[in-house]
């Protein structure tokens, strides 16, 4: 999108569309809970979504009309991510149904470890590819084509995975009361409220990060790839560490500590300029350490709150609130940047971006403190339930 010279707001919006597209997940239970077997439907969603997103790179070969290309890219990315968000709900429930509750956390840790290793290698290699082609269209063509091949391979492998039969409601119907059940669960409702405000506060600035690094701080793709590799390597290194901490201190401890470490990345970004670009090497360390524990713990935590039945509705509400927050976030970030003052001194070069990161840090810290550092009596509710 930066290559196509899109507007800052469109870049921020589409850059985050993979997250906010999950809003439609709220309707997923009406389909998934009527299906005993979901694999063929999920694979169809998988392939269609990836084909739409990966194929945007071929648009300049079809037309030279810049307005048409931008419109087509926007439609294909949004539609592809909407389908992917719908797929994500079903695939996550499928994945979690393959393991017992006792083995769940260990399975999530091992799976995440391998995912992070693959992400690290891929992001590093693709950054090198872009720089080898001098950030030209050919470089993007190679990357997106490679991604398309990997996506098709992934679908073929997925077709070989065993699928347990899903227990559907008597008569094959699924009611509105079943879809609304997560909102009646007080603990899960509290978790949903946290999810909304936590991701809203972070995404209102993070949705503009790639734009800020490339267009304003003027970093090359190799350096950005190094930053991503540092984050992913740190996550890989800390995955097993957080797993040991969880066994000793509990899931709640991991959540409340790792959440704080995550948002420290945004504090560092608030001081990032062309002059201070080297501090960017510290930001992924906090991101890697924090997300190394938080992303796994938040998945385990929400599945601990869910009953064994009707998980699609619970996962759907999580996806919907997460998606809604990330849809609103770029607009909120854009609004704040129009209001924030232009300052130019030794600390601030692009003050509107930098102050936005600082606001993200402050608001997200407040959300974390309210959720995880409330009076001891409230915290013990979850701890006691774990022991039970």
Indicate where each model-derived feature is located.
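C-terminal transmembrane helical hairpin of 12-TM major facilitator-type secondary transporters
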Residues: 253-295
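Juxtamembrane intracellular "pre-TM" segments in multi-pass secondary transporters
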Residues: 163-193, 216, 381-388
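Multi-pass alpha-helical transporter architecture, strongest
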Residues: 24, 56-61, 150-162, 353-388
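Substrate-agnostic recognition of the 12-TM MFS/MFS-like secondary transporter fold
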Residues: 14-29, 42-49, 72, 76-137, ...
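C-terminal ends and interior cores of transmembrane alpha-helices
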Residues: 46-67, 131, 260-275
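Short amphipathic helix-loop junctions that connect adjacent transmembrane helices
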Residues: 1-10, 207-224, 341
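Juxtamembrane helix-start motifs in multi-pass secondary transporters
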Residues: 40-44, 143, 250-257, 356
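Helix-to-coil boundary motifs at intracellular loop junctions of multi-pass secondary transporters
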Residues: 3-4, 34-35, 94-98, 212, ...
């Amino acid at each position: 999108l930066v290559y196509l010279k899109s507007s800052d707001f469109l870049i921020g919006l589409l850059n985050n569309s993979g997250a906010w597209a999950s809003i439609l997940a709220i309707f997923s239970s009406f389909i998934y809970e009527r299906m005993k077997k979901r694999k063929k439907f999920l694979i169809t969603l998988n392939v269609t979504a990836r084909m739409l997103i990966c194929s945007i790179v071929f648009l300049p070969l079809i037309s030279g009309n810049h307005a048409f290309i931008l419109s087509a890219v926007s439609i294909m990315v949004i539609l592809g991510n909407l389908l992917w968000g719908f797929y994500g709900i079903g695939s996550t429930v499928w994945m979690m149904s393959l393991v017992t509750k006792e083995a769940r956390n260990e399975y999530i840790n091992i799976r995440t470890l391998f995912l992070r290793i693959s992400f690290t290698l891929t992001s590093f290699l693709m950054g090198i590819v872009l720089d080898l082609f001098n950030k030209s269209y050919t470089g993007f063509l190679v990357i997106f084509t490679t991604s398309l091949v990997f996506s098709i391979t992934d679908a073929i492998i997925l077709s070989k995975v065993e699928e347990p039969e899903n227990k559907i409601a008597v008569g094959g119907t699924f009611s509105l009361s079943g879809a609304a059940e997560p909102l009646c669960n007080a603990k899960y409702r509290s978790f949903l409220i946290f999810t909304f405000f936590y991701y809203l506060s972070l995404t209102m600035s993070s949705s503009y990060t790639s734009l800020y690094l490339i267009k304003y701080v003027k970093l090359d793709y190799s350096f950005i790839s190094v930053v991503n590799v540092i984050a992913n390597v740190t996550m890989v290194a800390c995955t097993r560490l957080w797993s040991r901490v969880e066994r000793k201190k509990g899931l709640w401890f991991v959540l409340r500590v790792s959440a704080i470490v995550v948002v420290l990345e945004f504090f560092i970004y608030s001081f990032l300029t062309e002059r201070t670009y080297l501090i960017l090497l510290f930001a992924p360390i906090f991101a890697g350490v924090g997300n190394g524990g938080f992303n796994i713990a938040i998945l385990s935590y929400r599945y601990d709150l869910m009953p064994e039945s009707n998980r699609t509705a619970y996962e759907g509400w999580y996806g919907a609130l997460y998606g809604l927050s990330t849809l609103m976030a770029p607009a909120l970030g854009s609004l704040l940047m129009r209001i924030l003052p232009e300052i130019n001194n030794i600390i601030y070069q692009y003050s509107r971006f930098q102050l936005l990161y600082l606001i993200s840090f402050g608001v997200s810290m407040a959300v974390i403190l309210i959720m995880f550092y409330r009076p001891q009596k409230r915290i013990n509710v979850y701890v006691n339930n774990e022991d039970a």
